[in-house]
Curated annotation (Swiss-Prot):
Signal sequence extent: none
Family: Belongs to the dienelactone hydrolase family.
Reactions catalysed according to its record: 2-(5-oxo-2,5-dihydrofuran-2-ylidene)acetate + H2O = 4-oxohex-2-enedioate + H(+)
Molecular function via GO: carboxymethylenebutenolidase activity
Superkingdom classification of source: Archaea
PANTHER family listed in its UniProt record: ALPHA_BETA-HYDROLASES SUPERFAMILY PROTEIN, CARBOXYMETHYLENEBUTENOLIDASE-RELATED
Keyword Ligase belongs to the record: no
UniProt entry tagged with the keyword Hydrolase: yes
EC number per UniProt: 3.1.1.45
Keywords: Hydrolase
Xref: Pfam families: DLH
Active site: C148, D195, H226
Protein's name according to its UniProt entry: Putative carboxymethylenebutenolidase
């Protein structure tokens, strides 16, 4: 079964895609990439349902869906990513981009670039309410799973609620890193070998995992790039994606026992 549902969160009705078999073994909260709740995330949710799991994929852009659609986001982020890494801390670089954007583009940039932390704080609140919604459905165990931006949000969510497991696809570390001590269940981390901005955080992550004695399965795919699991994207890596999916299935079987 699959359907669109809405759940309450801080005065808003958050839209979400639900895919589930009868009598699911556990539930997975699927957190989208920077592109929002799109066909790729829905397909991943269906794949999880086919494995016997409930999958709930919230549209964490519901509050700003009038401007945060995939086309607008691509238009802005391609400009942002065109800035050389060494100039991304220079306010003048962003000012040049902002001056070339229309009003919707400027709103996207404000939400996802200039005020990203504030936006993600609200998304975490809405993800917590997704956890509460899933909990109300009678499922005994709940896992978070996220990609890119959503990987970081899935990781952060694990520091906020007692998840039974966390699956991070090339997402940033929780903030602050010490929050890892709050994580309850095991973690599966799947990373691209050619992803310097994310991979730079892995040594600190591993140190924190050791310090707080957490359960982490870490896999780095040499030669793969950020977003290697997205079969609609230019960075799709079939070999890495297939191996990662097998690891996801194995991890979920372990957690569901």
């Amino acid at each position: 079964m699959e359907k669109e549902i809405f759940y309450d969160s801080d005065g808003a009705k958050i839209r979400a895609f639900l895919a589930t078999p009868e009598n699911p073994k556990l539930a997975v909260i699927v957190i989208h990439e920077i592109w929002g709740l799109n066909d790729n995330i829905k397909d991943i949710s269906r794949r999880l349902a086919n494995e016997g799991y409930m999958a709930l994929a919230p549209q964490l852009y519901t509050r700003n869906e009038d401007v945060l659609n995939e086309g607008n986001i691509q238009n802005v982020m391609m400009k942002v990513w065109s800035i050389p890494p060494e100039k991304r801390n220079d306010p003048n670089s962003y000012q040049q981009i902002m001056s070339a954007l229309d009003e919707k583009g400027k709103k996207v940039a404000e939400l996802l670039v200039l005020n990203r932390q504030k936006t993600e704080e609200q998304m975490i609140k809405d993800a917590i309410k997704a956890y509460e919604y899933v909990s109300s459905q009678g499922v005994k165990k709940i896992v978070s799973m996220g990609f890119c931006m959503g990987g970081g949000l899935a990781f952060q969510l694990a520091t906020e609620v007692p998840l039974d497991g966390t699956i991070v696809f090339y997402g940033r570390n929780p903030q602050p890193l010490e929050a890892i001590q709050k994580i309850k269940g095991p973690i599966l981390g799947l990373y691209a070998g050619e992803d310097p901005p994310i991979d730079a955080g892995l040594p600190d992550l591993i140190s924190a995992i050791i310090k707080y004695k957490k359960d982490l399965e870490l896999k780095i795919y040499p030669g793969a790039y950020h977003a290697f699991f997205n079969d609609r994207g230019r960075s799709y890596n079939k070999e890495a994606a297939e191996d990662a999916w097998e690891r996801v299935k194995s991890f979920l079987r372990r957690v569901s026992k």
